[in-house]
Amino acid sequence: RSAGAMGVVLEDQTWPKRCGHMRGKSVVEAEEHAAKVRAAADARDGERFIITARTDALDTDGMDEALRRALLYKEAGADVLFVEGPRSREELELIGRELPPPLAVNLVDGGNTPHFGLEELEEMGFFSVGFVVSGLYAAAAALERTYRHLLEHGSTGGLSETMMSFDEFNDMIGVE
């Protein structure tokens, strides 16, 4: 908080962490993670600081365990609950029915969780929707196209329509 953070996401994965939509994850004991959530909640100094508790147990231990963990983390002081990696509309709806709001979900392009519109997800009970790699994937595709063009043509000629101008970029980052 002293560094200006307004919140934190605490995950129950073991180290080294993997993307929640990848195989090969494992989770710590639920009570161990709940203790971390409780410590974060107890450390709040009265200022509004949002604690999001994420569980990856859906993939490792199934829905019942993921829901149990999420409820345990709520009891420990989490403000927002986040069950990572639902694989269907039915799983999303079940999470929305069984857990108290507010709820968070990640939509990873090409990942496990099917994409729905923001209104639909809100109706299912989700208030926070993370498109966590969409911008990265778009930027990577643009970089790949640009450097392939440079390799093939030796210049950026013909790319100006797909690029920001020098002035546009400086305006975007607030440099005069």
Regions found by a protein language model. Name each.
Residues 1-131, 138-148:
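Alpha/beta enzyme core
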Residues 134-176:
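Extended, intrinsically disordered, low-complexity segments
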